[in-house]
Amino acid sequence: MTHKSVRDYIRTIVDFPHEGILFRDVTTLFADPRGFRIAIDQLLAPYAGMRFDKVAGLEARGFILGGAVAHQLSTGFVPIRKKGKLPGRTISVSYQLEYGEAVVEVHDDAIQAGEKVLLVDDLLATGGTAEAGIKLIEQLGDQVVGCAFVVDLPDLGGRRRLEAMGMEVHALCAFEGL
């Protein structure tokens, strides 16, 4: 029996959402129980022996991964959502998109000051959303001690952007090109 890598479970869709784009679809990874288990185990591997108070996941696929990682760590999960999706009091950070601006939010009481947080998402492209998530967590007085992704798109510079902020970045696989 051959063992598949996480990369083998990820489907590439040509010209989605726009012509010239190679979309890396992780839903095929999520749908396969073996692939999903491998991904969660590998997301956790670099952090063996470390203690986290919370896992934060970026909307939307980061919720799937972050929830599973938090379960494995027996810790709480904090969703970082698009503006207007969370009830109650929130704090927000805006960040630049290719054509405009976006805002992400978190509940202002989701994480207690001084907690250590692992940030999780499916894909690292430019790093804008992850950077905004890190800034939200830091506004609450907490420390992001790692950023874990399934896919890194190195040509888009997200890893360099987060490492320039002093973040430790872990990705299970990389896909060159757009």
Swiss-Prot record:
Pathway: Purine metabolism; AMP biosynthesis via salvage pathway; AMP from adenine: step 1/1. InterPro entries: Ade_phspho_trans, PRibTrfase_dom, PRTase-like, UPRTase/APRTase. It comes from the Bacteria. GO terms for cellular component: cytoplasm. GO terms for molecular function: adenine binding; adenine phosphoribosyltransferase activity; AMP binding. Keywords: Cytoplasm, Glycosyltransferase, Purine salvage, Transferase. PROSITE patterns: PUR_PYR_PR_TRANSFER (PS00103). The keyword Glycosyltransferase applies. It is found in: Cytoplasm. Its main location: cytoplasm. Its EC number is 2.4.2.7. The keyword Transferase applies. Catalyzes a salvage reaction resulting in the formation of AMP, that is energically less costly than de novo synthesis. Belongs to the purine/pyrimidine phosphoribosyltransferase family. Homodimer. NCBIfam families: apt (TIGR01090), PRK02304.1-3 (NF002634), PRK02304.1-5 (NF002636). This is Adenine phosphoribosyltransferase. It comes from Cereibacter sphaeroides (strain ATCC 17029 / ATH 2.4.9).
